[in-house]
Amino acid sequence: EGSGGSGSSGNFTTASNIHMSSVTNTSIAGTGGTGTGTGTGTGTGTGTGTGTGTGTGTGTGNGSASSNYRGGGVAIQPVTLTESLLNK
């Protein structure tokens, strides 16, 4: 904004008043977002086992056997001894 002056001898004088408004830049720092995460996991396992065993046993037994044999005998015939047989 300025105003000019007047001059009578051909001299021109100019006076100027310049007003500038100051500009202030304000920056706002941004904030980061938040995040959440979930995770699942599974696990498997195997196992083996072996075992051995022995066993013994005893046993008793009773047995009997009998035999009855009746065989026919030879019949003994009576012999008559005579004098003629004895003298031979």
UniProtKB/Swiss-Prot annotation:
Main location: nucleus
Sequence repeats mapped onto the chain: 30-31, 33-34, 35-36, 37-38, 39-40, 41-42, 43-44, 45-46, 47-48, 49-50, 51-52, 53-54, 55-56, 57-58, 59-60, 61-62
One CC-aspect GO term: nucleus
Annotated segments matching region 16 X 2 AA tandem repeats of G-[TN]: 30-62
Compartment(s) of residence: Nucleus; Cytoplasm, Perinuclear region
Superkingdom, natural source: Eukaryota
GO biological process: rhythmic process
Post-translational events: Phosphorylated with a circadian rhythmicity, probably by the double-time protein (dbt). Phosphorylation could be implicated in the stability of per monomer and in the formation of heterodimer per-tim.
Record's compositionally biased regions (Polar residues): 79-88
Stretches the record annotates as Disordered: 23-88
Record's keyword annotation contains Repeat: yes
Keywords on record: Biological rhythms, Cytoplasm, Nucleus, Phosphoprotein, Repeat
Compositional bias segments (type: Gly residues): 30-62
Domain notes: The run of Gly-Thr is implicated in the maintenance of circadian period at different temperatures. Deletion of the repeat leads to a shortening of the courtship song cycle period, and thus could be important for determining features of species-specific mating behavior.
Subunit structure, interactors included: Forms a heterodimer with timeless (TIM); the complex then translocates into the nucleus.
Protein's job: Essential for biological clock functions. Determines the period length of circadian and ultradian rhythms; an increase in PER dosage leads to shortened circadian rhythms and a decrease leads to lengthened circadian rhythms. Essential for the circadian rhythmicity of locomotor activity, eclosion behavior, and for the rhythmic component of the male courtship song that originates in the thoracic nervous system. The biological cycle depends on the rhythmic formation and nuclear localization of the TIM-PER complex. Light induces the degradation of TIM, which promotes elimination of PER.
Protein name per its UniProtKB record: Period circadian protein
Gene label: per
